[in-house]
C-alpha cells in the first residue's frame, strides 16, 4: 500500500477514534445540562483534537507539511459532519439537537485548528516525525470502536448516572 494511502487511512482512524471518544466523554455532562456539555466541548475537545492532529501530522511523509495539514483538515471536517449525522440522526434520532450554533462553530474551529497547530508547533512536528506502524492504527482504532460501542449501549439502554 502506498505511504500516502496509509496516512490517509490513519487520519480516518484517528478522527474516528477522537470523535467517538469525545462524544463518550461529553455524553453524561451534556445529558445533565446542554450548556455544561457545550462548555466542556469547547474546552476539552480542542485538546483531544489537538492530540490527534499532532499524531497525524508527525506521521505525514510528504515534503510539504502544509499539504498534510490541508488533507488532515478536510478529512477531519468531512468525518465530523458524517459522524454527527450518524450520531444525532441515526443513533439518537435527534437531528434538531445537531444544527445548533455551537455545531457550526465546532466545524469552523476544527477546520482551522490543524493550521493553528502547524503554525504553533511546526518545529516540534518536524522534529517528532515517525513512521506509521500497525500499532498506531490498532491503538486508535480500538479506542474509537470501544467508545462507539459503549456510547451506543448507553443510548440504546438509556443508562443514567
Task: List PLM regions with ranges.
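Membrane-interface helix-boundary motifs at transmembrane edges
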Residues: 1-3, 34, 58-68, 125-135
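Alpha-helical transmembrane segments
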Residues: 6-23, 111, 141-150
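Loop-to-helix transition at the N-terminal end of transmembrane alpha-helices
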Residues: 31-51, 69
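Hydrophobic cores of alpha-helical transmembrane segments in multi-pass inner/ER membrane proteins
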Residues: 45-55, 106-121
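Transmembrane alpha-helical segments of multi-pass membrane proteins
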Residues: 68-84, 136-145
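C-terminal halves and exits of single transmembrane alpha-helices
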Residues: 75-98, 113
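Membrane-helix boundary connector in multi-pass membrane proteins
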Residues: 89-99, 118-135
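Juxtamembrane boundary at the C-terminal end of a transmembrane helix
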Residues: 150-161
